[in-house]
Structures are given as C-alpha cells and as structure tokens.
Amino acid sequence: MTVSSRWIPLFLVGSALLAQVPPAPPPPPAPPAPPAPMIGVDVPTGSRTEQRTEKLAQGSKLWVKNRNGGIRVTGWDKDEVALTAQIRDSGRRRVELVLQRKGADLDIEAVFQQPSWSFGVYISPRCEMTLMVPRKLQGHFRTTNGTVAAENLEGFARCEATNGSILVTHIRGEVHVDTTNGPIEARGLAARIKGSTTNGRIILEDIDGGIRLETTNGSIRAHNLDGWGEGIHLESTNGSIEVELGKATGDLIAENSNGSLEVKVSGGQVIEQTKHSAHVKVPGRNQAIRLETTNGSIRVR
C-alpha cells in the first residue's frame, strides 16, 4: 500500500464528520419599524421655564391672567415686574406669555392655544406664574384651576379663582377675594377685606380692617380682628363659625338656624339671647359685628 492510499480512508472519515456539522444559524431579523403616530394624539413637548422683566412704577396698575395654573405675587422695592413661568404644553396646544403696556400700566396674560375641532387625545397645558412686583400697586390677579397668592403689597389687590384657593398675606390697603371650590385664607392684613367662596372654608388671622366675607358649604375661623370701625360681617351656609374678636369691639349679633350658639366675650353686655341668637354689646367702637350661619354652630370669644 502506498502512502497516498493510506490517507484516503482518513480523508473519507473527515469528510463524513464535516458533513454532520450543522450549518450556521441565519442572522437575526431586523428590528420592527417604530409605530406611526396615532391620528389625533397630541404629543407633549415637556416643560420649560420662561422669564420676562418689565418696568413698572410704584402705584401703577397690574393685571395678571392665567387659565390653568397658579399665580403667586410678592411685592418688592424695585420699579419692575419679574415674571417666571413654568410651562407644560404640547405641539397642538401651546402656551404663550403676552405682556402689553396700557399707558403706564401693565397687562400680563398666559394665552392658551385652543385645540382644533377634531377627534383625538389632547394634552392639557399648564402654566405656573411667579411674579415679583412693585410693592405699591393696584393689582388684579385671576386664574382657573390654580391658587392665587399675594403677599407684601400696599394699595389694592383683587384676587379671583375658579377651582382654586386664595391666600393673601401682609397686605396694606384693600383686598377683594372671590373663588369657587376653594378656601380663602388671609393673614396679617392692615387692610379691609371683602369677598366670597363656594365650597370652601375661610380662615382669618390678624386682620385690622373691616371685613365682609361669606361662604357656602364651608366653615369660618377668625382670630384677632379689629374692624377699623367699618364693621365685621361673616356669613356661612352649612358651616360653623368660630371667632376670637381680639381688639374688635362694637354691637355683636350672632344667629344660626341649626346648631349650638355660645358667646363669651370679656366685658360684653348681653342685650338679648335665645337658643339660636345673641345680641351682645362690646364696649369700644360703634361698629356692627354680625355672624350668621345655617346648619352650623357659632362660638365667640
């Protein structure tokens, strides 16, 4: 047997073994293409911060209007307005800040783009506005679905909200407050205050000026009042009233329809008292202090 003839069986065995090796696996399939955007679906663009600065003299008028978000206003000693807005919107519903001069006064509005008349899912835009403003001014602040908060101001402040709370602190002059489905809280006011809320409580602390406030379906808590001789009128429907008069004096009348009634004022002279009414003279100023509720208790100290 020659050398070459000896290698022939080995070659045949190797060929058989190679034939038994499985073929290489096929390459993995390509990833699927991303789904096409759904028709009528609004894609959010994320949140962003925008800032504006505008000159405004002390004692000027300022209007601030928002639609879906809060307004927070703080007075400072600069003759300018510094606005910071936290905005969340989408490609189809943009939020734009519009500042307009009205002579020496200023109007600021967060303008919300309206969706087109088509079926689909839309992102609800939101804008939270924070402002530093001249301390002395005549301010008008209004929003929907958000809180209106104002502090450290002198002059006049009108705060309006729908589905939101109103918070006013350390203001001198005059304050008007109105909201629906939200509380009213006022603290440290050297100012008269009037207004109303529906489905919200009222909290008052350290109020020097005259008061005329009412609520529906909410309680009233008031501590350390004065009245400035202008009078105090607190009224609720379906809510209790609790008052600590503080420095407030005058002719006190408290009435309710259902609920207990208790008036214990140091130095007060009881003119008349029944189960659901009390007339007490508190020596001092000649002002009317009237507390009224339906379906709620009244406590006066």
PLM ranges: what are they?
Residues 1-301:
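Intrinsically disordered, low-complexity terminal regions
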